Amino acid sequence: MFEATTILGYRGEFDNKKFALIGGDGQVTLGNCVVKANAIKIRSLYHNQVLSGFAGSTADAFSLFDMFERILESKKGDLFKSVVDFSKEWRKDKYLRRLEAMMIVLNFDHVFILSGTGDVLEAEDNKIAAIGSGGNFALSAARALDHFAHLEPRKLVEESLKIAGDLCIYTNTNIKILEL
């Protein structure tokens, strides 16, 4: 259940305009059975200034969302400070260290992966990040499309997630996308 989804975050500049998008599939899997095909695993936070998405246990992810949103509010939307404080708080709490979820959070300037161990990882290129069972498929597709095609950002996210959905049995092509 920990990896059974695909979430893709993408930020940058297109035609001299900054963008930030997050997309995810809608499949919820319990063991080897699909129990829902249209779940929403992405959210807009802090007055639509930060995007987030999760992979993993739904109950754990909602706990993480709530905690991260509280910290983000206290830091007045400063994403960098929020992820650092989030990681510190996560590592101090025995309960949180056992949560089986990962998150991507991003804005116009940063893309971070928050791991199940409390680690904060900035995307290698600070542009594209993916998590979940189809994450590597989506990440590879997004990097290739970003490098070789001049696609609108929304189309790039959609096509990358479709490729992941075609290859990963825990990911479907019922795609939801949010953008700043």
Swiss-Prot record:
Residues noted as binding Na(+) in the record, renumbered to the chain: 165, 168, 171
Key words, A-Z: Allosteric enzyme, Cytoplasm, Hydrolase, Metal-binding, Protease, Sodium, Threonine protease
Main enzyme class: hydrolase
InterPro entries hit by this protein: ATP-dep_Prtase_HsIV_su (IPR022281), Ntn_hydrolases_N (IPR029055), Proteasome_sua/b (IPR001353), Proteasome_suB-type (IPR023333)
UniProt record, GO biological process: proteolysis involved in protein catabolic process
Cellular compartments annotated: Cytoplasm
Broad class of the protein's primary localization: cytoplasm
Regulation of catalytic or functional activity: Allosterically activated by HslU binding.
A GO cellular component annotation in the UniProt record: HslUV protease complex
Known EC number: 3.4.25.2
Catalytic activity: ATP-dependent cleavage of peptide bonds with broad specificity
Active site as annotated: 5
GO MF term list: metal ion binding; threonine-type endopeptidase activity
HAMAP family: HslV (MF_00248)
PANTHER family, alphabetized: ATP-DEPENDENT PROTEASE SUBUNIT HSLV (PTHR32194:SF0), METALLOPROTEASE TLDD (PTHR32194)
Database matches in NCBIfam families: ATP_dep_HslV (TIGR03692), PRK05456.1 (NF003964)
Similarity comment: Belongs to the peptidase T1B family. HslV subfamily.
Entry function: Protease subunit of a proteasome-like degradation complex believed to be a general protein degrading machinery.
Known partners and oligomeric status: A double ring-shaped homohexamer of HslV is capped on each side by a ring-shaped HslU homohexamer. The assembly of the HslU/HslV complex is dependent on binding of ATP.
Protein name, entry field: ATP-dependent protease subunit HslV
UniProt organism field: Helicobacter pylori (strain J99 / ATCC 700824) (Campylobacter pylori J99)
Organism taxonomic ancestry: Bacteria, Pseudomonadati, Campylobacterota, Epsilonproteobacteria, Campylobacterales
